């Protein structure tokens, strides 16, 4: 089975937008400011973006607020070609714990993470449909630790369910992850050492 090049698909979409002089709207699910840094710098050249900060997997309120505030600060400090807005999803850790019930002991990157991806991407697709966005996608594919093919498959599935276009991506390509590190340093962004949930925090602590 041939491996799908999601960055190549995105390149094709962007090329078509440029040929038609079209600037569509994009609802971008964002997990944190560092991951969003390159994605926003890159995509804002071609899309009118609204950041959707929806991360009920972050179990500690202080951590959640810190990440949200860093996202807002980064957006305010950047000079984007097209304006970038931000909306906040409901912060309900109980929603996350309900979604992953029975999978608490799964390893990082396993079935529990898949459920978390599904929770966040379905909500993003639903909001994109309700607010009439042209596309939706997520910053999660920038992480070397995240399964980009799985994320794209989930996104495509909910695109069909909610009748809204999924923007394929693998943002770690084209040195995207390295660029995010540079941007994070330039803006002194808070870079956490775990994804967000108590389980990933525990695993990170065990590795230290």
Predicted regions and their residues:
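Aromatic pocket-lining residues of Rossmann-like dinucleotide-binding sites
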Residues: 43
